[in-house]
Structures are given as structure tokens and as C-alpha cells.
UniProtKB/Swiss-Prot annotation:
Cross-referenced Gene3D superfamilies: 1.10.8.60, ClpX chaperone, C4-type zinc finger domain, P-loop containing nucleotide triphosphate hydrolases
Family of this protein: Belongs to the ClpX chaperone family.
UniProt feature coiled coil, ranges: none
Protein name per UniProt: ATP-dependent Clp protease ATP-binding subunit ClpX
Pfam families: AAA_2, ClpB_D2-small, zf-C4_ClpX
HAMAP family: ClpX (MF_00175)
The protein's assembly and partners: Component of the ClpX-ClpP complex. Forms a hexameric ring that, in the presence of ATP, binds to fourteen ClpP subunits assembled into a disk-like structure with a central cavity, resembling the structure of eukaryotic proteasomes.
Positions of Zn(2+) binding: C17, C20, C39, C42
NCBIfam families: clpX, PRK05342.1
A GO cellular-component term linked to this record: HslUV protease complex
GO BP terms: cell division; proteolysis involved in protein catabolic process
């Protein structure tokens, strides 16, 4: 119901939104219904909720899983660029769950699993792609760090701890866990330390690759429900990893030089044109990746063989980083604007400020991951001062603020009122 305020001697009624309680003076538009009112902000919020529900209950294909186009459409909402990688992932995930539906029909033909390897520079969106995928298809999803894994019997995490974490994410529902997704990050850090055999065991490199082979291929893992060490008297949960989709990701620093060296061998003669690594972007070089390059990098043949789908990601340029700052549903600029909105302050970024932030991230070679730290540094003083300042309505960030040659511009309510009176 609408609220009515007489405002002292004013005989005009003030109308209020029946949902959020804001007055007609606080919103752009107030829509009247039979006995209720709704503001434009609440309408927009309702539309966002409906869109999210439509995305989460996407139209299914005949096999009961999202089609590649539907998966790609949702990825586009959250991840900027990386079109080729998104297509590869969309098809791979669709086929994986189609295979699960096919198995339940007891067909004579057994469809093999296709695990995925994501190769791309730091901060290009490998981990974020995997997280977004898990959100789309609503299955248990966990992330594991390959650098913490060691062979069984050594100090560090056992590879079976990965399955335990997945089981915990599925609330100990074994059947649901067996259809989940595991993302193993920093997989390039478990490469073989050297080509020469050594008398000492490589427990965090090749040893981890060997340990991962079985669970990636498919085995029944005995997982202690409470975690920790296994005891003979303990009851174990049996988890079949055959249908768990494994996605491995890594930056593979130095792999571009291996790929370029292979290309130089094939380009010989007076007419051959060979670009050096410095002249080409890393993402461009990664597009020529072959399994033999991964072997030279230090991955063992059996491990590479269990990752048949390889998706390469491009390094992000300034334009892509500006898009990442502003366009996705949970873009960084939108996040900070929401924080400032809690103080009833509007945060505004000029276009030159966004490009300056993107340029800094490119110079640091940190990709999208470095954008937040740059934003935090720019806004730190403002976020420190703002809660104690009165009357601030707007904070404006220009390119000079990003460069450090100026302070953010504070616009106070009184000045805005003065501008309104002048224009009137």
C-alpha cells in the first residue's frame, strides 16, 4: 500500500514504493497499480531475478543437459573474450553430460571421458571459466591447487583429498559427487623437474602426475569420511571417479618458447619469415600448441593422454580489460559502485580512468587478476574518509587520479542543489 505524507503544511500527498519504501522524489519513476505502487529500481531488480532464474533453469536439450549454445550464452554474460576457449568448454561439458545420460541407457557402445586442459597466461580467466561452468550446470564443483599435492606417504595433500573435498561439496551425497567437476589449478607446477633420471624421488612433480592418472582415468577411491589419515578400523566411502570431469589449468610459463622453437625448425630458407617470441603475444603462440610441446615442458605422456581436450586462452589487451571492468554482471566497477551506494554516494569513473587502470594491469603482466589491487589502491583513501564525511553525493575518478597526479573529486549535495537552481 502507498504511504501518504502531508509534510507539515504541504497538502500534496507523497507517494511511496510499496516494495522498497522509497518516495517518489527518490526514484526516477513510480508506477501505479490498483492500490499499490512500484518504482523503476524495483522493476529492474525483479527483471534481474527473472533473468537469473531463466538462466539457472535453461532450456534443456533432449538428453536433459544444456546445449553448447546455451552454455556459451551464459559464459558470455560473465567472461569477456576468450571465444575459442568458451566454445571448446561448452562442447566438452555438453558431451560429458550427454555421455552420462547415454550410459544410463545401457548401450553397447561405451563413450570415453574427455578431460580438459586450459592453457593461458596469468589472469586471463582460466579459473573463472571453470567456476562459471559449475554454476551453469549446477553440480558439485571444487578447486584444488596442484602445488600442495604430493605422492601418498609424503608431507602434503594426498590426491585422494581432492575426492574428499568434492564429496563435502556434495554434502556427502556419493551419487551427486560422482557427476561433479574438479578444477586442478597450477598444473604446470607439477611438471617433471628435469629430463634426466635422478636417484631422488620427485614427489611434488612427476610423482603427483602419476598419482593423478588413476583418479582422472577412473577408479574407485576409498575416502575416509572425516578426512585425515586412513585407519584399518575406519569405514570408507567408495567414490567412482569415472564420471567426474577433470579440468586442469596452468599458465605454463616458458611454454611459448618451446612452441616457437618447434616452429623455427620448420621455417627455414631465405624466404622464411619467423617472428621472435617478443614480437608475438603469448596467447597467439599458444594457439599453435601440440601435445609434444607439453611433453617437452615436463608433463608425462600418460598425463597428457588423459587430457584430450586442450583449450588455449589469449592474453588480455587494454580494450578487453576495460570491458572486464565494466560489462560483466559482477564487473569490478559495479562492485565498487555498490559499496559506495551503501554510503549513499555515487561512484563515477571517466573513460580515461578505466583505460589508465587497464594499462597498468597490462604493464604489470597480471591480467584481469591485477585489476582489483589497482582499484583498491586508487580508492583506499576515499573509502577511509567517506564514512566520516557528510554531504558527499558523488565521487569522480579521472585518469589523473589513477596516475597519482590528482585526488578523487568529491561533489557535495549543496553544490548539486546549486547547479539545479541555476539550470532552473
Amino acid at each position: 500500500m502507498s504511504k501518504v505524507s502531508n509534510g507539515g503544511g504541504d497538502s500534496k500527498n507523497t507517494l511511496y514504493c510499496s516494495f522498497c519504501g522509497k518516495s517518489q522524489h527518490e526514484v526516477r519513476k513510480l508506477i501505479a497499480g490498483p492500490t499499490v505502487f512500484i518504482c523503476d529500481e524495483c522493476v529492474e531488480l525483479c527483471m534481474d531475478i527473472i533473468r537469473e532464474e531463466n538462466k539457472s533453469s535453461m532450456v534443456k536439450s533432449r538428453e536433459g543437459v544444456p546445449t553448447p549454445q546455451e552454455i556459451m550464452a551464459v559464459l558470455d554474460d560473465y567472461v569477456i573474450g576468450q571465444k575459442d576457449a568458451k566454445r571448446v568448454l561448452s562442447v566438452a561439458v555438453h558431451n560429458h553430460y550427454k555421455r552420462l545420460a547415454h550410459q544410463s541407457k545401457n548401450s553397447d557402445i561405451e563413450l570415453a571421458k574427455s578431460n580438459i586442459l586450459l592453457v593461458g597466461p596469468t589472469g586471463c580467466g582460466k579459473t573463472y571459466l571453470a567456476q562459471t561452468l559449475a554454476r551453469i550446470i549446477d553440480v558439485p564443483f571444487i578447486m584444488a591447487d596442484a602445488t600442495t599435492l604430493t605422492e601418498a606417504g609424503y608431507v602434503g595433500e594426498d590426491v585422494e583429498n581432492i575426492i574428499l573435498k568434492l564429496l563435502q561439496a556434495a554434502d556427502y551425497n556419493v551419487e551427486r559427487a560422482q557427476r561433479g567437476i574438479v578444477y586442478i589449478d597450477e598444473v604446470d607446477k607439477i611438471s617433471r623437474k628435469s629430463d634426466n633420471p635422478s636417484i631422488t624421488r620427485d614427489v611434488s612433480g612427476e610423482g603427483v602426475q602419476q598419482a593423478l592418472l588413476k583418479i582422472m582415468e577412473g577408479t574407485v577411491a576409498s575416502v575416509p569420511p572425516q578426512g585425515g589419515r586412513k585407519h584399518p578400523q575406519q569405514e570408507f566411502l567408495q567414490v567412482d571417479t569415472t564420471n567426474i570431469l577433470f579440468i586442469c589449468g596452468g599458465a605454463f610459463a616458458g611454454l611459448d618458447r618451446i612452441i616457437s622453437a618447434r616452429g623455427e625448425k620448420t621455417s627455414i630458407g631465405f624466404g622464411a619469415t619467423v617472428k621472435s617470441v617478443d614480437e608475438r603475444r603469448i596467447g597467439e603462440v599458444f594457439k599453435e600448441l601440440e601435445p609434444e610441446d607439453l611433453l617437452k615442458f615436463g608433463l608425462i605422456p600418460e598425463f597428457v593422454g588423459r587430457l584430450p581436450v586442450i583449450a588455449t586462452l589469449e592474453d588480455l589487451d587494454v580494450d578487453a580489460l576495460v570491458q572486464i571492468l565494466t560489462e560483466p554482471k559482477n564487473a569490478l566497477v559495479k562492485q565498487y559502485q555498490r559499496l559506495f551506494d551503501m554510503e549513499n554516494v555515487e561512484l563515477v569513473f571517466h573513460d580515461d580512468a578505466l583505460r589508465a587502470i587497464a594499462n597498468k594491469a597490462v604493464e604489470r603482466k597480471t591480467g584481469a587478476r591485477g585489476l582489483r589491487s589497482i582499484m583498491e589502491k586508487i580508492l583506499l583513501d576515499t573509502m577511509f574518509e567517506l564514512p566520516t564525511l557528510e554531504g558527499v553525493r558523488e565521487v569522480v575518478i579521472s585518469g589523473d587520479v589513477v596516475d597519482g597526479s590528482a585526488r578523487p573529486l568529491y561533489i557535495y549535495a549543496e553544490r548539486q542543489d546549486e547547479k539545479g537552481n541555476v539550470s532552473a
